[in-house]
Amino acid sequence: MKKNNIILNDNEIDISKSDPNSSLLDWIRLEKQLHGTKEGCAEGDCGACSILLSPVNGGKLRPANSCLLKLGQVVGSSVYTVEGLGSKKLPSPIQKSLTKYGGSQCGFCTPGFVIAITSLLNHKEKPTEIDIHDALAGNLCRCTGYRPIVEAIEKIDGDIPSIFSIASTICLLYTSDAADEHTG
């Protein structure tokens, strides 16, 4: 990976012409035109702006609040938005289950829940109800309530695609390239 790049939904992107001080959320929505990631509270409390982020050091992907991060902070990282996890034509098992079992009404908060659930299920194959509640603690929903969301998670059918090993490999390659660049 090049020095001023990030991986966004498996695509390497040069961000050298973007403002490193803009919020990651604004960059995702305004420059990349990915509107699944939303601004709810702009304080990191609601989960509407959630993305999956893998640090440069190759650590595991974790949910992060894109409204609290500057674009310059994620150089060398892998970032996944809800668009990188599924689509209208090919929804992920999580998206299918939320739709099928009434885990979404207006849909504003749904992308954040999909991010949180994806992270949970990639770290824990058979989560308990307590695990599910813990994973969803940073997400707010004003319409559906939480019971249908939890029930939809418990009924997910199908393999959850693991994007974690791919992102870790990409980040390790970036770290190696950066080390080579500095050591000549």
Model-derived segments and spans:
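Signature of N-terminal electron-transfer/Fe-S-associated modules in redox systems
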Residues: 1-176
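Single conserved hydrophobic/aromatic residue that forms the stacking wall/gate
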Residues: 174-184
